[in-house]
């Protein structure tokens, strides 16, 4: 807690040079000082959100996400560029195919009107396999990763050069959206010496990016308040970036205990003043949610992470700390499709983010929008000094106040929250503020539990100035008149005074709020009690004030008329209240064209202030409007509530054995021979030959091994596998299941002693025994996992005979994903497939035709599999949403459930070739898996059938049978939409070709 009241007290903590604002000296239009970023000479509050295009493999949907974030107050997107997504093998890069086409990312950002903060690594983290390192390099070849090691440099520098040039071509200097470029990621500068290996490594990154043509400011993100790294203002010995950033995940929230956490950090300001005092305060990653692990609580069931109150209190606290650059991690999480995840996460990467994995808008995003729209129109907020903070501003000591003051305009911003930020008690208090008319005691300010407010003084609204206002400002517009929007919780009291206005202006109130006026020495005080819905005050000087309750404010949009400009001015947007989403607002001739999405039939209100507009359309259809007494227009737009969605039943299954490799006579002549006695990896194997899959070019996905040995008196084998948390494995001797491990969410390396039964499993003398081991895979480790970090090996660490020292394997062979590093399915990329038999043959791909002549039958997943067995199932379906399918957004997923008698199992689901579900029913937590349009085909109006190929594999990990008694399509919400999701997506769905050589 900080109980000092005045800036002079604060200054005792810091060096006098804190007062000196340092400007940037880059050659780009992006500049900075100690207050904020400036672009083209205008200060900007950077309200960014993290988005990972790798987790949404349909490029067209990137625009959908960007439009939703822009409409909800964001003006920038922070993006990791993952090396492993673009490079399947050394020297090979793909920046053009499908979801690898990063130019489309930049183009969509420009179209939506959002800036890009580029984060190219080379190490990224982000709960992605190997933290984003190319998997072909993460097999031990990286050497001294994240150091100046020349072996490491030789591998990462080509990547950074190539992606650096692409980013450079899309900088704001070139007409693109990129305004900042981050060097590395959360790299802690533990030693401040010029010859330190980390310093030299950061210098190498700077040199590579400079040579690639990067001229916008560089940034870095400190890994919490643990070290002081790469700031020009603190022990700069090299490697420092232009703008220091801090990552913070302060919530301390619990999915199982709703009363836990919710504790604010109130020391950001002090931290930045100590370590980056000439730079704007930048929270490069601020908690927008959090990931949950295998065996944890699923995101939809974690109410504490989804609460909109978190966005209200924590993001306003950042404002109080004088932060002017903020990026929420994540804004949209997406899906860990294929095998892109690190072992700490499962298929969903929803992250409890403001925008759901299904691309649906959560209440948390609606609440976030209220602050985003406020910062967009508040330039005085971008040049403030800390006037003071503490509990002495209010009556009673239970309210904490941040007091910020713009020294040039005298505008003040008082951020108030309960001192105990986790309190759920409602409180009422008075607040003393300073205004241009002197000190004022604002009375009767209410805070509900877990609520925060920004009280403003001397705040300009066009030609009008608020001397003070105790309600939250949502936004304002300067149109034909000045229009202000305020919001409060229903029943709360707000007061405001108009500076330099005539006393007792006449006014008319519309709606359910009650308004009174009274005299004061500073002017007329207007006091109101917030009613439900929309209220408005029309003053005789034409000033218009909207009074909105919080839930109505959630449905408030201020779409800009200049779509591609992220820096929206008050005279460049209009107001639309009521829809689920407003994507765009454009004026063509005398028509205002609105596009967007809507859930239920809704009354909307529009204030555009343009006398030349004579008609309004919504998604191309003319609206019948009525004019209100205060100049807005009202209309009704349709929703999707009356549309019946009938999902097809998944029937007509075809099934085939998925583990023919356990047959001792199986032909593995085309498999890779494991014959290495040394490894790229520094971790010594437990036995020879080396069985690390990465040494043989197989990286992502399950792998299968076959080891041969002669007659033996051994009593068994000890198998040790390492394939990520929760990854299980099974073993068969001469076609007979002999055991395995079911996987543990807290352990990534597992070992088991498998006993031989000589009477049933071992071959007689002179014959050959075959041990087959099938291993699951949950990803490569990130940098924080010892001993070898992202280079921890995958596959089998060793297989050792028990009871015999003379028995040895005569050979080992291995199969992984078809083609290994050749990346034979370039569009879906190098991390989509694994080494299951049916995958290698392409059974999961559209166009594959199962034939009863080749061992296929009509069993369904509900029929199940015997213990220690593995089957593949395939069916087709058509999704017809009706004649208006092009104007609907109906997120679809698949629900899986193991039967009550099912043993531990692994189930995978592929849709049109994309692996979109990794289901471990004995571990959890996920049971419903969303499918994205583009991966999913939706029947259009063109007439031809757009089929979907759905494939399921079911693997019983023990000798217990396993079955899926539920495999069904489910719908999430349904919305009318201007975004066409029922397109021809065939370019994203390459069809089956013969792959028999990979058997």
UniProtKB/Swiss-Prot annotation:
Keyword rRNA-binding: no
GO terms under cellular component: extracellular region
Keyword terms, alphabetized: Carbohydrate metabolism, Disulfide bond, Glycoprotein, Glycosidase, Hydrolase, Polysaccharide degradation, Secreted, Signal
Family (UniProt): Belongs to the glycosyl hydrolase 35 family.
Cysteine disulfide links: 255-302
Active-site positions on this chain: 186, 285
Domain of life: Eukaryota
Keyword Signal: yes
Span of the signal peptide: 1-21
Gene Ontology biological-process entries: polysaccharide catabolic process
Compartments, as annotated in UniProt: Secreted
InterPro entries: Betagal_dom2 (IPR018954), Betagal_dom2_sf (IPR037110), BetaGal_dom3 (IPR025972), BetaGal_dom3_sf (IPR036833), BetaGal_jelly_roll_dom (IPR025300), Galactose-bd-like_sf (IPR008979), Gly_Hdrlase_35_cat (IPR031330), Glycoside_Hdrlase_35 (IPR001944)
Sequence positions that bind substrate: 80, 125, 127, 185, 249, 351
Catalytic activity of the protein: Hydrolysis of terminal non-reducing beta-D-galactose residues in beta-D-galactosides
Glycan-carrying positions: 25, 195, 274, 389, 441, 512, 519, 600, 675, 713, 757, 808, 897
Gene name, Swiss-Prot/TrEMBL: lacC
Name of the featured protein: Probable beta-galactosidase C
GO molecular function list: beta-galactosidase activity
This enzyme's EC code(s): 3.2.1.23
């Amino acid at each position: 807690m900080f109980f000092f009241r005045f800036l002079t007290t604060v200054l005792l903590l810091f060096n006098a040079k804190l007062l000196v604002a340092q400007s940037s000296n880059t050659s780009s239009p992006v500049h900075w000082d100690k207050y904020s970023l400036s672009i083209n000479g205008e200060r900007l509050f950077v309200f960014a959100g993290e988005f990972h295009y790798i987790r949404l493999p349909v490029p067209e949907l990137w625009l959908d996400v960007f439009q939703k974030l822009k409409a909800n107050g964001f003006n920038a997107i922070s993006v990791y560029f993952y090396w492993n997504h673009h490079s399947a093998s050394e020297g090979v890069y793909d920046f053009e195919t499908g979801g690898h086409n990063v130019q489309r990312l930049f183009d969509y950002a420009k179209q939506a009107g959002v800036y890009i903060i580029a984060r190219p690594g080379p190490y990224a983290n982000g709960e992605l396999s190997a933290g984003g390192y190319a998997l072909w390099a993460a097999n031990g070849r990286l050497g001294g990763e994240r150091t100046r090691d020349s072996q490491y440099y030789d591998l990462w520098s080509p990547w950074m050069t190539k992606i650096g040039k692409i980013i450079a071509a899309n900088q704001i200097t070139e007409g693109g959206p990129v305004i900042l470029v981050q060097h590395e990621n959360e790299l802690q500068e533990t030693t401040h010496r010029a010859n330190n290996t980390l310093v030299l490594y950061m210098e190498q990154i700077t040199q590579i990016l400079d040579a690639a043509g990067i001229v916008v400011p560089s940034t870095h993100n400190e890994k919490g308040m643990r070290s002081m790294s790469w700031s020009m203002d603190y022990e700069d010995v090299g490697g420092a970036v232009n703008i220091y950033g801090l990552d913070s995940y302060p919530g301390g929230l619990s999915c199982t205990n709703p009363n836990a956490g919710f504790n604010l950090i109130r020391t950001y300001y002090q931290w930045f003043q100590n370590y980056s005092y000439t730079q704007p305060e930048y929270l490069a990653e601020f908690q927008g949610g959090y990931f949950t692990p295998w065996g944890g609580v699923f995101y939809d069931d974690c109410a504490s992470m989804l609460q909109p109150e978190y966005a209200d209190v924590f993001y306003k606290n950042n404002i109080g700390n004088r932060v002017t650059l903020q990026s929420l991690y994540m804004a949209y999480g997406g899906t860990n499709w294929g095998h892109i995840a690190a072992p700490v996460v499962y298929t969903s990467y929803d992250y409890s983010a403001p925008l759901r994995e299904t691309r649906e808008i959560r209440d948390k995003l609606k609440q976030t929008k209220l602050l985003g729209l406020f910062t967009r129109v508040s330039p005085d907020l971008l040049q403030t000094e800390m006037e003071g903070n503490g509990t002495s501003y209010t009556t009673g000591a239970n309210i904490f106040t941040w007091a910020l003051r713009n020294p040039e305009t005298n505008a003040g911003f008082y951020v108030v929250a309960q001192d105990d930020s986790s309190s759920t008690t409602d409180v009422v208090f008075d607040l003393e503020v300073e205004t241009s008319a002197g000190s004022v005691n604002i009375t009767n300010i209410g805070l509900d539990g877990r609520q925060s407010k920004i009280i403003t003084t001397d705040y300009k609204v066009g030609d009008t100035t608020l001397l003070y206002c105790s309600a939250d400002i949502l936004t304002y517009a300067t149109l034909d008149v000045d229009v202000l929007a305020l919001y409060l919780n229903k029943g709360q009291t707000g007061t405001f005074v108009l500076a330099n206005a005539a006393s007792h202006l006449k006014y008319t109130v519309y709606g359910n709020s009650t308004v009174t006026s009274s005299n004061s020495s500073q002017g007329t005080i207007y006091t109101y009690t917030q009613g439900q819905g929309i209220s408005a005050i029309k003053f005789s000087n034409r000033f218009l004030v909207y009074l909105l309750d919080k839930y109505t404010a959630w449905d408030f949009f201020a779409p800009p008329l200049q779509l591609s400009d992220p820096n929206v001015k008050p005279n460049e947007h209009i107001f639309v209240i009521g829809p689920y989403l407003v994507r765009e607002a454009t004026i063509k001739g005398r028509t205002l064209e609105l596009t967007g999405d809507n859930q239920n039939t809704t009354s909307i209100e529009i204030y555009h202030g343009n006398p030349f507009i004579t008609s309004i359309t919504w998604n191309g259809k003319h609206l019948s409007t009525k004019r209100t007494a205060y100049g807005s227009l009202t209309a009704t737009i349709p929703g999707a509530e009356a549309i019946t969605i009938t999902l097809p039943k998944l029937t007509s299954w075809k099934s085939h054995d998925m583990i023919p490799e356990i047959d001792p006579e199986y032909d593995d002549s085309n498999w890779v021979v494991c014959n290495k006695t040394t490894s790229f990896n520094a971790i010594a194997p437990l036995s020879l030959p080396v069985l690390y899959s990465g040494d043989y070019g197989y990286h992502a996905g399950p792998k299968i091994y076959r080891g041969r040995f002669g007659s033996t008196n051994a009593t068994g084998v000890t198998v040790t596998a390492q394939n990520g948390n929760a990854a299980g494995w099974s073993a068969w001797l001469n076609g007979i299941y002999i055991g395995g491990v079911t996987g543990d969410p807290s352990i990534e390396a597992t070992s088991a002693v498998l006993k031989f039964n000589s009477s049933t499993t071992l071959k007689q003398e002179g014959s050959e025994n075959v041990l087959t081991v099938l291993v699951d895979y949950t990803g490569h480790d990130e940098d924080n996992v010892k001993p070898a970090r992202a280079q921890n090996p995958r596959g089998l660490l060793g297989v050792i005979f028990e009871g015999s020292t003379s028995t040895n394997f005569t050979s080992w062979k291995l199969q992984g994903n078809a083609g290994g590093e050749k990346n034979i399915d370039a569009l879906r990329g190098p991390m989509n497939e694994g080494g299951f038999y049916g995958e290698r043959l392409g059974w999961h791909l559209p166009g594959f035709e199962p034939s009863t002549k080749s061992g296929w039958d009509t069993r369904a997943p509900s029929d199940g599999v015997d213990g220690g067995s593995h089957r593949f199932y395939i069916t087709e379906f058509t999704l017809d949403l009706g004649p208006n399918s092009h104007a609907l957004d109906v997120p679809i997923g698949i629900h899986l459930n193991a039967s009550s008698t099912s043993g531990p199992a692994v189930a995978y689901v592929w849709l049109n070739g994309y692996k979109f579900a990794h289901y471990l029913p004995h571990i959890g937590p996920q049971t419903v898996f969303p499918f994205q349009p583009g991966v999913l085909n939706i029947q259009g109006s063109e007439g031809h059938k757009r089929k979907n190929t759905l494939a399921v594999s079911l693997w019983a990990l023990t000798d217990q049978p396993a079955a899926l008694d539920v495999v069904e399509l489910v719908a999430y919400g349904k919305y009318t939409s201007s975004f066409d999701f029922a397109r021809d997506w065939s370019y994203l769905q390459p069809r089956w070709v013969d792959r028999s050589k990979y058997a």
